[in-house]
Amino acid sequence: KRCNEVAVVLNEVRASSKYKLYDGNYEDILTYKAEYNCESMLESNRIFDASNSMDEFSFFEVMNHWRTDKLDMSGSNNQFNGTGWGFMVPQKKLYDAFVQEEGVDGYRLNQTMKTYDQISQLGVKVAKGQSLINEGYFMWKRRFSNVESPAGFWCSYNNYRWMRYAEVLLLAAEANLKDGNQSEADACLNEVRQRARLDAKTATLDAIKLEKRLELCSEYTRYQDIIRWKDAEALLKDQGERTPILSNKAGKDEPDNVAVEYIQYNKDKTRYGFKERHYLLPIPAKEIRLNPNMEQNAGW
C-alpha cells in the first residue's frame, strides 16, 4: 500500500553503493569465514574467547544443526560439531524448487543444502538402526563446524546475521514492481540472480517470490512473507499431515539401508495445515471479558 515510499528508501540504499553482494564462496555467507562482509547490513558481534565461553552461551547453532544423535559422523574427520537437535530441516519441495530453477548442479543450490547422498560422501550418515525426521536433505549454509565452537556445543563465535543486502534488493524489486518501475525491479532481481549464476529474467511478483524463497531460505523471512502475501493457506494447507522419517534399517553387520517413508499421525484435517483464521491470533478471553465491545477475530 505504501510501495512508492518503500521503493524510494530502498533505492536510496542501492544508490549509496555502501553495500554489495558477497562474492566469496556462497556456502560461507552465514559462517564465521564471512563475518562483516560487504553484504551484511545488520549483524551481532560474538567474540572468540574460549576462557569466557559462557559469554557466548546460545542454543542457536545447536537448534539449526543436524540431528547428530541419530547420525554416524565418524567419517567426517571431526569437521562438524557433534551436538545438534535438527530443527532446521529443508523440505523436499524446497529442493525441488531449487532444481526446477537452477538444475541439479545449480551453484547456489549445492552451496545451500546437500542431499543425503552428498552428505554421506562427506562422512555423515544415518546411524544403523536409527531414524530422524527428514526427507533426505541437510541445510549446508547453516552447518555447525567444530572450529567455531572451541569450548563446547553451547557456544559459538560465529556472528548472528539479521539482514543482508540480498534481502534489500529483493524487497526493492517487489516495491519497484508494485510502484510501476519495471526496469528498477528487473535490475534488483537480476543482481541477485547473477550472483547465483542464473540468467536474467523479467521481474514479476511470482519471480520475486521464488527468488526470495531460494536466496533467503533458512533466514527467517519466509513465514512473514507468505503471511503478508496471503499465500499461507495455499502453501501450508497440508503442513503437518504427514511426517517424513529418514531411517537406516540395516543391522550392525549389514550394509546401509537408508530410505524415507511418510507416516500420517494426524487424521483429522482440522488439526493440521494453515487455516484462514491463522492470519490473526485470537484475542485473549480476558480482554474480551474486560471490554464487551471487543469482537473476537474471525474463526476463533
Regions found by a protein language model. Give the residues of each.
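C-terminal structured "cap/appendage" subdomains that terminate the fold
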Residues: 185-257
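Surface-exposed intrinsically disordered loops and tails
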Residues: 76-78, 249-264
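Structured, solvent-exposed acidic/aromatic patches
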Residues: 1-60, 149-165, 178-186, 198-204, ...
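Extended, compositionally biased alpha-helical segments that mediate assembly or anchoring
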Residues: 276-300
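Flexible, polar/acidic helix-loop-strand segments at domain edges
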Residues: 93-165
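An aromatic- and glycine-enriched ligand-binding surface/loop that stacks and positions planar moieties
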Residues: 1-125, 239
